[in-house]
From Swiss-Prot:
Inhibited by EDTA, EGTA and 1,10-phenanthroline. Addition of Mg(2+) or Ca(2+) increases the casein hydrolysis rate. Its cofactor is Zn(2+). Ca(2+) binds at E17. Its EC number is 3.4.24.-. One of its GO terms (molecular function) is metallopeptidase activity. Keywords: Calcium, Disulfide bond, Fibrinogenolytic toxin, Glycoprotein, Hemorrhagic toxin, Hemostasis impairing toxin, Hydrolase, Metal-binding, Metalloprotease, Protease, Secreted, Toxin, Zinc, Zymogen. This is Zinc metalloproteinase-disintegrin-like daborhagin-M. Belongs to the venom metalloproteinase (M12B) family. P-III subfamily. P-IIIa sub-subfamily. N-glycosylated. Contains 16 disulfide bonds. Expressed by the venom gland. GO terms for cellular component: extracellular region.
Length: 25
């Protein structure tokens, strides 16, 4: 479901992981 895809993108945990990945790079 397309609604479930953006849901995980808007998740706070996903955002934190994204920042960590960028910070680690």
């Amino acid at each position: 479901v397309a609604t479930s895809e953006p849901n995980r993108y808007f998740n706070p945990y996903s955002y934190v992981e994204l920042i960590i990945t960028v910070d680690h790079s």
